[in-house]
UniProtKB/Swiss-Prot annotation:
This is E3 ubiquitin-protein ligase CBL. InterPro entries: Adaptor_Cbl (IPR024162), Adaptor_Cbl_EF_hand-like (IPR014741), Adaptor_Cbl_N_dom_sf (IPR036537), Adaptor_Cbl_N_hlx (IPR003153), Adaptor_Cbl_SH2-like (IPR014742), Cbl_PTB (IPR024159), EF-hand-dom_pair (IPR011992), SH2_dom_sf (IPR036860). Residues 358-906 are annotated as: Required for ubiquitination of SPRED2. The modification Phosphotyrosine is found at Y371, Y674, Y700, Y731, Y774. Residues 1-21, 432-462, 477-498, 519-667, 680-719, 743-781, 799-854 are annotated as: Disordered. It is linked to Noonan syndrome-like disorder with or without juvenile myelomonocytic leukemia: A syndrome characterized by a phenotype reminiscent of Noonan syndrome. Clinical features are highly variable, including facial dysmorphism, short neck, developmental delay, hyperextensible joints and thorax abnormalities with widely spaced nipples. The facial features consist of triangular face with hypertelorism, large low-set ears, ptosis, and flat nasal bridge. Some patients manifest cardiac defects. Some have an increased risk for certain malignancies, particularly juvenile myelomonocytic leukemia. E3 ubiquitin-protein ligase that acts as a negative regulator of many signaling pathways by mediating ubiquitination of cell surface receptors. Accepts ubiquitin from specific E2 ubiquitin-conjugating enzymes, and then transfers it to substrates promoting their degradation by the proteasome. Recognizes activated receptor tyrosine kinases, including KIT, FLT1, FGFR1, FGFR2, PDGFRA, PDGFRB, CSF1R, EPHA8 and KDR and mediates their ubiquitination to terminate signaling. Recognizes membrane-bound HCK, SRC and other kinases of the SRC family and mediates their ubiquitination and degradation. Residues 648-906 are annotated as: Interaction with CD2AP. It comes from Homo sapiens. One of its GO terms (biological process) is cellular response to nerve growth factor stimulus.
Length: 906
């Protein structure tokens, strides 16, 4: 029976697999009267504090037995998540890491409340799995039998347990008492109710939640428990709570959202896997618009929506930066999510769209003065320097504009662009301009980023078949008013790193003018302010396809560094002007941005780029150690993304759901499940996402929550397609040239002519990669570059960095430190480089002709080159200064440092 998993390990009170129902009920009653004491006696025969190495090793033996049973060829397990033959070895490996970290301190580990509960539950679940094989016998080998379904459920539970263990013991060290809940108000609730506890009995949790979000009945409580208790152990951990509050955000209407989306919605599927979603939707293959949704098992805290397209394909996608109800409403309006589980009546979720109170960021006088000195304002997004900040990343609290966040995520950006912390949620914010008269307000003070004490994992996975319970509850459902407990807590804010990279022209902008510009931006940005969560740009006027020589890139491998190739003089806006005030923040998000420079970095094993594929498989930890360090003193990444490309990706139906080639997990005991790299590439004609039917893990690459619209072959989508193709092959061409010639890293003469030629060479790749412009384009020559090893990526990351930073091929990539872990800035920084003037003689189009237009300019250029500046740097400075030679000299002095001592004389 589908509910057996829960009955024996969850709702039944956690009595052993042979425990009686009355024993479990007594245990639950004791919980109710002893809210802060845990009933370990009914979880395991071990008394509290007896988790020792011997018990762990006994558990390992049970896990090994389960693995051997599951390796039976007759079982023919599918190599897709949740894959028990990966999960148990990974769990074993992480437990070994934990034990090694607590070598000699086993008593401390054994007394850890969370670890005790986890080990007891792991022991119980492995025994339960072994019993399943004994009782199921030959039926275990029938793919659609009930015992086999129960095995899939247990696999999901093991998957949740591993994710939770990695979340509470990252790197093997306990951090449950400092775990960051994503949603601020949810974090405040947990802190007030449970302090620094990592795990609490279900009864204690239910009582505390009931005080804030009233639970109407025992039936509702049971259904709620089956949703929150992902590991089915009668406890709620801070990790599980975080997942639940992310899934059913916003907090103010948490249980109302849960009732509407999980209890009464026919499209909700509890504990379903990627393959099971496909199998279920196969019944409605001739009914386009049929859809169901489930919790992603590989990315806890996010939803996965499966749906049938007009041309009979089954796709699955993950919505980003918006609650599920908003994604379902948007998908219904666009014609994708019409028939939940094939039913003709689609629930109306618009009642959930009450405007959520926006977090107001108050600018302090100190910040106001600091930004005025730099010719900027606090509310201006520091990535694009065009739009106002209107979204806060959770849990780290950094601020930016929606356009930049959307572009970053669609371009495979891993984590927060400022600090690389995992993005587990977003909240709309309003930055209130500094008011000298009303500076005493106690609203949240503004800063570049606010590390909030919260962390959110929107993950609610049905711990097992509670279908009957849900149906019963749905029949007696009562609409609940929004909870008054909805105000976000205050949070301390980090210091703002000063922006010393602004040009003199911006520095001298009067603060009043700056404030006026910001006011107009705020007005233009008011489009978002009334939405529950920021949404990506919608289908609007797409930019025309870029010219072939435009060096913006969509290459996935370049994304974690977030450094686009430099603007050519023809398409780069003059940097001595203030960025244009957009008429619409969304509509103008594709405008070219000023391209800055940053220090180049040497290859590093901890380079965030080298870890890209590591983040694709298991949900925790999501970041490498180097990515987790906030490093406020490190210069931010030196450029903006190509937002014109991002806009096209974001708004076009071509940005389909899970549409990336699978990634090979580089290192883990669990290799089999991630060996789908040989899966054939998508046919060019297929919309993106349709090739994603191999496994759920492609969810990680989902660039947009927008589902594919197969019926729409409008001109805008074709324009987007072209935009994506050209940009992706631009990166590929440059990477190929850079990879094939090691000497290029010191003295390449890669100019626009080479770039155009590179485009021509990569033509055949365009159609192959148009469906998913986010994976690394496979170059025709040499083929081995299409799938590089981590060491290849590490070696190439920084060497490609200089290509994408400033287009100066003479930069010596062996100089420089670690990869900057900061987001791009709108203007260039100093860059240390060794330049050979002779290698830069080939001009680049318009700038070259402009620079040589007058004899005076020519002589000045020769003079500057004799001082050690490269020809390309002089070109750029002249473009920025609009051929004002004095201004160009100032720019060169300020932003270009060279090894030649001649530079000192200038």
């Amino acid at each position: 029976m589908a509910g057996n998993v829960k009955k024996s390990s969850g709702a039944g009170g956690g009595s052993g697999s042979g425990g009686s129902g009355s024993g479990g009920l007594i245990g639950l009653m004791k919980d109710a009267f002893q809210p802060h004491h845990h009933h370990h006696h009914h979880l395991s025969p071990h008394p509290p504090g007896t988790v020792d190495k011997k018990m762990v090793e006994k558990c390992w033996k049970l896990m090994d037995k389960v693995v051997r049973l599951c390796q039976n060829p007759k079982l023919a397990l599918k190599n897709s998540p949740p894959y028990i033959l990966d999960l148990l070895p990974d769990t074993y490996q992480h437990l070994r890491t934990i034990l090694s970290r607590y070598e000699g301190k086993m008593e401390t580990l054994g007394e850890n409340e969370y670890f005790r509960v986890f080990m007891e539950n792991l022991m119980k679940k492995t025994k339960q799995t072994i019993s399943l094989f004994k009782e199921g016998k030959e039926r275990m080998y029938e793919e659609n039998s009930q015992p086999r379904r129960n095995l899939t459920k247990l696999s999901l539970i093991f998957s949740h347990m591993l994710a939770e263990l990695k979340g509470i013991f990252p790197s093997g060290l306990f951090q449950g008492d400092t775990f960051r809940i994503t949603k601020a108000d949810a974090a405040e609730f947990w802190r007030k109710a449970f302090g620094e506890k990592t795990i609490v009995p279900w009864k204690s949790f239910r009582q505390a939640l009931h005080e804030v979000h009233p639970i109407s009945s025992g039936l509702e409580a049971m259904a709620l428990k089956s949703t929150i208790d992902l590991t089915c152990n009668d406890y709620i951990s801070v990790f599980e709570f975080d997942i639940f509050t992310r899934l059913f955000q916003p907090w103010s209407s948490l249980l109302r959202n849960w009732n509407s989306l999980a209890v009464t919605h026919p499209g909700y599927m509890a504990f379903l896997t990627y393959d099971e979603v496909k199998a279920r939707l196969q019944k409605f293959i001739h009914k386009p618009g049929s859809y169901i949704f489930r919790l992603s098992c590989t990315r806890l805290g996010q939803w996965a929506i499966g749906y049938v397209t007009a041309d009979g394909n089954i796709l699955q996608t993950i919505p980003h930066n918006k609650p599920l109800f908003q994604a379902l409403i948007d998908g219904f309006r666009e014609g994708f999510y019409l028939f939940p589980d094939g039913r003709n009546q689609n629930p109306d979720l618009t009642g959930l769209c009450e405007p959520t109170p926006q977090d107001h960021i108050k600018v302090t006088q100190e910040q106001y003065e600091l930004y005025c000195e730099m010719g900027s304002t606090f509310q201006l997004c520091k990535i694009c320097a065009e739009n106002d900040k209107d979204v806060k990343i959770e849990p780290c609290g950094h601020l930016m504009c929606t356009s930049c966040l959307t572009s970053w995520q669609e371009s495979e950006g891993q984590g927060c662009p400022f600090c690389r912390c995992e993005i587990k949620g977003t909240e709309p914010i309003v930055v209130d301009p500094f008011d000298p008269r009303g500076s005493g307000s106690l609203l949240r003070q503004g800063a570049e980023g606010a590390p909030s004490p919260n962390y959110d994992d929107d993950d609610d996975e049905r711990a097992d078949d509670t279908l009957f319970m849900m149906k019963e509850l749905a029949g007696a459902k009562v609409e609940r008013p929004p909870s008054p407990f909805s105000m976000a807590p205050q949070a301390s804010l980090p210091p703002v790193p000063p922006r010393l990279d602004l040009l003199p022209q911006r520095v001298c902008v009067p603060s009043s003018a700056s404030a006026l510009g910001t006011a107009s931006k705020a007005a233009s940005g008011s489009l978002h302010k009334d939405k529950p969560l920021p949404v990506p740009p919608t289908l609007r006027d797409l930019p025309p396809p870029p010219p072939p020589d435009r060096p913006y890139s969509v290459g996935a491998e370049s994304r974690p560094q977030r450094r686009p190739l430099p603007c050519t003089p023809g398409d780069c806006p003059s940097r001595d002007k203030l960025p244009p005030v957009p008429s619409s923040r969304l509509g103008d998000s594709w405008l070219p941005r000023p391209i800055p420079k940053v220090p180049v970095s040497a290859p590093s094993s901890s380079d965030p780029w080298t870890g890209r594929e590591l983040t694709n498989r298991h949900s925790l930890p999501f970041s490498l150690p180097s990515q987790m360090e906030p490093r406020p003193d490190v210069p931010r990444l030196g450029s903006t993304f190509s937002l014109d490309t991002s806009m096209s990706m974001n708004s076009s139906p071509l940005v389909g759901p899970e549409c990336d080639h699978p990634k090979i997990k580089p290192s883990s005991s669990a290799n089999a499940i991630y060996s789908l790299a040989a899966r054939p590439l998508p046919v060019p004609k297929l919309p993106p996402g349709e090739q994603c039917e191999g496994e759920e893990d492609t969810e990680y690459m989902t660039p947009s929550s927008r589902p594919l619209r197969p019926l729409d072959t409008s001109q805008s989508s074709r324009a987007c397609d072209c935009d994506q193709q050209i940009d992706s092959c631009t990166y590929e061409a440059m990477y190929n040239i850079q990879s094939q010639a090691p000497s290029i890293t010191e003295s390449s003469t890669f100019g626009e002519g080479n770039l155009a030629a590179a485009h021509a060479n990569t033509g055949p790749e365009e159609s192959e990669n148009e469906d998913d412009g986010y994976d690394v384009p496979k170059p025709p020559v040499p083929a081995v570059l299409a799938r590089r090893t981590l060491s290849d990526i590490s070696n190439a990351s920084s060497s490609f960095g200089w290509l994408s930073l400033d287009g100066d091929p003479t930069t010596n990539v062996t100089e420089g430190s670690q990869v900057p872990e900061r987001p791009p800035k709108p203007f260039p920084r100093r860059i240390n480089s060794e330049r050979k003037a002779g290698s830069c003689q080939q001009g680049s189009g318009p700038a070259a002709s402009a620079a040589t237009a007058s004899p005076q300019l020519s002589s000045e250029i020769e003079n500057l080159m004799s001082q050690g500046y490269s020809y390309q740097d002089i070109q750029k400075a002249l473009v920025i200064a609009q051929n004002n030679i004095e201004m160009a000299k100032n720019i060169l002095r300020e932003f270009v440092s060279i090894s030649s001592p001649a530079h000192v004389a200038t």
